[in-house]
Amino acid sequence: MENLEKNTKKKIKKPNNFKKNNKDKTEELKDKPTPRMFKMTPKSSKFLHQLGVTGRKHTEKPVPLNDPDYEKKIREIQAKEAKKIRSDEVVNNNSKKQNNNKQAKKKANKNKKQKGNNNNFQNNKKPENWKQKPAANNQVKAIPNSEKSTAKTAINLIIKRTFETLKQNNLIAPNLKQNPNKKDKPQQPNVAAKNNNQKEVKKPYNNFVNNQKNHNKNNAGNKGDNKQPTKPLNQSKLSKSTIVELPFTPNFTSNQPKPTQKEDSKKVKAKKAENSQPQESNKQVKKLEVKTNQQKQDQTKKKQPKENKNQQIKAVNLNNNQQKTNNNNQKNSVDKSENDNNKKKSEANQKQENLNPNNNNKKKEDSKNESNNIPLINKNISDQQIVKISNYIKDNYPVIYADLKEKNRLGFNSNLDDDKLIVYANYEAKDLELLLKKFKVVTNNIGLYEEALTHNSYANEMHLKYNYQRLEFLGDAIINKIVAEYLFNHSDSSEGEMTKDRIKIIQSNTLIKAATQLELINYIRVGEGLKIAPLSPKILEDIFEAFIGAMYLDQGEYAVRKILNDTIIGYYQKGQLTENTDYKSIFQEIIHSTGLNMKIHYERTYDRQKNLHTVSLYAGGIMYGEGKDSSTHKAEIKAAKEAISKFRGLLKLEK
C-alpha cells in the first residue's frame, strides 16, 4: 500500500514563466556585436591590445608585438578605456568616500567652534599665568594722559623690560665717561708655555657663556614671581676685552606672561585702531636706543685691539728668542756632523782616484752629458700629442709596411715573410661590453665573442676546450663570400681583374689595418708567457676573422656587412689599399717566360685535428713549393713564395 501511495503522488512541476521574445528586439540586436558575458582579468599586459580591460568590444586598433613603442601605446589605450568605462563598484566606493569626508568636515568645524568659545574670558576656567596680566594693565593706567598714546602698546613695555634685564646681566657696555680714571689692568701673558711654537689666543666668548649660565640658575627659582631677576654672583664689571657682539638675540622674556594666541575679534580690531598712530613713534625710539648701544660698543672696540696687540707682541718676541737659540744649536750640531762625513768621503774618493783614473774621466763625461740633457726633460709632451702619434702609428703602420715590401718585391729578396710587424697584448684584457657598445650591439651570446678572442696559450693554461681557430675558419669564408658579391654587383671588370681586386681587399695588410682600427688586440686573452713577448701580426688577422665569424652567428649577415663596409670595403672604395705582392701571378709569369708549356696545379689537404690546410704547388709534374696555414688562400701564397725563391737565381727581372 505504501508503494501505491507513493506512485499515486504525482510530482507537480512548476511551470517556467518564460519571457516573451519580441521579434523587434532580436532583429535590432543582430546588427550590434554581442557583448562578452564573462569578466576579463588579463594577467599580462601583452594581451591587452586584443582583449581589453573591461571585456567589452575594443574600439582602438591592436598594437603589433614587434612595435618598439609597444608599452607606451598600451598605456595610452588603458588610460582611454579607464576614462570611458568605470565599474559600478568604483562609483559606489567614491560616493561613500565623499560622504565620509563631508561628515568628517562637519565634525571638525563643530570642534573648532567649541574651542573658540572656551578661549573667551567669560568662562569660569581661567588660563595659566592669569594673575600676572593685571600687573601689566595697572602699569598702563598709572601713566599720565600725555603719554597714553604711546604707553598703551605692549611693544614699549617689552622694550623697557628687555633693556632693564640687559643692564642687570651686564650685557650692555657700561658708560665709559662716568669712570674715565678707572682702567682695567691687562692680563699678563703666560711666558712659561710648554711649546715655544704655540701662541695664546684669548677667548672672550667664554665670559659670556659663564654669565649666561649663572643667569639661568638664578631665574630657575623665580618662575612664579613677578619680581625682578636677581643679579649673578660674578657682578664685577666687564673689562674692555670681554665685551662681545652677540651672534644671536637672547630671549629674556621667558618669565613674563605670554599673551593668549586667540583673542576676541572685537578686542583685536579696537587695538589695531589705537596702535596705528603710535607705531611710527615707537620705531623712532627703537632706532635711537640701538644707535646709542652701537656707538658705545664701537668706542670700546677701537681701544681693545691696541692693548691686545701690545700683549701679543711681547709674547711673540719671547717665543722668537727661544726659537732662535734652539735653531742655532741645531745648526751647529748638523754642521759638525756634515764636516765629519765630508772628510771621510774625501779620503775614500782620493784612494779610488789613485787606483782607477780612467773610470773617473768617464764619470765626468757622463755628468756633462746629463747636464746637457736636463732641459730636454723639462719639455713635457702633452697627452694630446701622444694620442695623435699613437693613432697615426696604429692606422698607418700596416700601409707603411706594405710600401716597404713593394720596393723590395722586384729584387726577390730572401725576406719574403710578412711577420715583421710587432704587436704586444695587454696584461689584462678589457671588458667585451665596451667593444660591443661601439657597434651598438645587444648580444644574445657573449660566449661566442669570448671564444673569438681567446688564444691557444690562454686556453691551455686555463684548461679550456675552445679557442678562436674554429671561428677563424668560418670568418674567412664569410669575408670571401661578401667581398666576391660586392665585386660582382658593383664592378663591370673581367674575371681576372676581379680576382686581383679580391686579393687586394683580403690581403693581410688590410685585415691588420681593420683589426687595429677596431682595437681588437686590447680585448684578446693570452697566456702569461705571451704577455711579455711580442706577438706576430698574423694574430691580428686571425682575431679579425674570428670576430667576424662570431658576429655572423650572433647578429647575422647584415651586421657583418656593416663592419666590412666601414673597414675593408671602405678602404677599397677610397683607394687606400696598396697592391700587395701577388706571388701566385708572379710564379705564373716566371713559368710562361721559360717558353715551356707547363701546367700549374695546386693540391690541397686538410688536417682536422690541427686545423691546418697544406697546399703543394706543381708545375709540369714537379713540386716547387709547399705551404701550411689555417686558410687555403694563405697556404697557396706560402707555396708560391717558396716556389719563387727557387727561381730567384735563374731569372734577372728588370727593376
Swiss-Prot record:
GO cellular component: cytoplasm
Keyword rRNA-binding belongs to the record: yes
Protein's name according to its UniProt entry: Ribonuclease 3
Family statement drawn from the similarity comment of this UniProt entry: Belongs to the ribonuclease III family.
Originating gene: rnc
Xref: NCBIfam families: RNaseIII (TIGR02191)
Residue ranges annotated for the RNase III domain, each copy included: 432-556
Cell compartment(s), UniProt: Cytoplasm
Superkingdom of the organism of origin: Bacteria
Regions of compositional bias (Basic and acidic residues) in chain numbering: 21-34, 69-89, 260-274, 298-309, 333-350
Class of this enzyme: hydrolase
RNase 3, as annotated region: 401-655
Domain DRBM: start-end pairs: 582-649
Region (Disordered): 1-148, 171-376
Reactions catalysed: Endonucleolytic cleavage to 5'-phosphomonoester
Bias kind Low complexity: ranges: 92-102, 206-223, 310-332, 351-360
Xref: SUPFAM superfamilies: dsRNA-binding domain-like, RNase III domain-like
Pfam families with a match to the protein in the record: dsrm, Ribonucleas_3_3
InterPro entries from the UniProt entry: dsRBD_dom, RNase_III, RNase_III_dom, RNase_III_sf
GO molecular function: metal ion binding; ribonuclease III activity; rRNA binding
